[in-house]
Amino acid sequence: MSVPNVDPSHQSNASANEATRPSPAAEGLDKSGERVREMFRQIAPRYDVMNHLLSLNIDKWWRRKAVQTLKIKGDDPILDLCCGTGDLAIAIADSAGSDVQVIGSDFCHAMLEIARVKESKRTRDTAGGSGRHTIPFLEADSMALPFDDDAFQCVTVAFGLRNIADTDQGLSEMARVCKPGGQVLVLEFSQPTLPVLKQAYNFYFRHVLPRIGQWMARNDKSAYEYLPESVGKFPCGDALAGRMRDVGLQHVTFRPLTLGVATIYVGEKPGGKTDHAEMAAHREREALVAT
């Protein structure tokens, strides 16, 4: 098994890189790196509870569905970026088996500290960690990942893409570090497809959740306003699938979950064995037509 090289200069500059990047005006939110990092630093101890509130406690099932979507082959490593407190990375590691190295990256140190505690407990509880890779959780800029091109068989992100200052740059980096033929997977909140549910969910987001946030929050009330707003303004469905295609991914599909409250998007990086087989078959068909 090969473990991707990490460029320490990228890792050490993660905070500076994201802090100085401007926020795109198109989505109408201040997603500058310093603002988002500080927000997540403040809510890190309650982040898991926040996700349960946002998802009405269905987020664990969504993650299981995301893991089941991955086509894990051989022992090539897997990257989960914007990993937060580590739930998806740990779920992937539990599913992938002991031969596959899973790596988590995030730009918020406080979130990574919680992920490391979870990982330490996981390795203790599973046969003492015998024969099992420990997940390294690295502080890194998702718009300038410190990994070589074509390093991972799968690159994933759950509930984090909408928080990257430049969505397209984040997707581009995911595609860059993915191996040809590998998968890029996004699990993200989206807009419910059923009109009645959409109306109820929007009411929950705009009126119920902020009140819960005010009760839970101390100095971080803005986080409980930003997170629902970021969901409402983030592209979903065909719009996000199109942006995945724009960064060079192919065979992009998406699957709404829980009537569209969340969606799994999957794309493939061109250049894998399947592509070569398809090209060979195409050439054979052309040769037959020519004769």
From Swiss-Prot:
Record carries keyword Methyltransferase: yes
E.C. numbers: 2.1.1.163
PROSITE patterns: SAM_MT_UBIE, UBIE_1, UBIE_2
InterPro entries: SAM-dependent_MTases_sf (IPR029063), UbiE/COQ5_MeTrFase (IPR004033), UbiE/COQ5_MeTrFase_CS (IPR023576)
Xref: Pfam families: Ubie_methyltran
Alphabetized UniProt keyword annotations: Menaquinone biosynthesis, Methyltransferase, S-adenosyl-L-methionine, Transferase
Ranges that cross the membrane: none
Biological pathway: Quinol/quinone metabolism; menaquinone biosynthesis; menaquinol from 1,4-dihydroxy-2-naphthoate: step 2/2
CDD domains assigned: AdoMet_MTases (cd02440)
Domain of life: Bacteria
Class of this enzyme: transferase
Region listing for Disordered, in residue ranges: 1-33
Biased composition (Polar residues): 8-20
Catalytic activity, as annotated: a 2-demethylmenaquinol + S-adenosyl-L-methionine = a menaquinol + S-adenosyl-L-homocysteine + H(+)
Protein task: Methyltransferase required for the conversion of demethylmenaquinol (DMKH2) to menaquinol (MKH2).
Family in the record: Belongs to the class I-like SAM-binding methyltransferase superfamily. MenG/UbiE family.
NCBIfam families assigned: MenG_MenH_UbiE (TIGR01934), PRK00216.1-5 (NF001244)
Record's protein name: Demethylmenaquinone methyltransferase
Species: Rhodopirellula baltica (strain DSM 10527 / NCIMB 13988 / SH1)
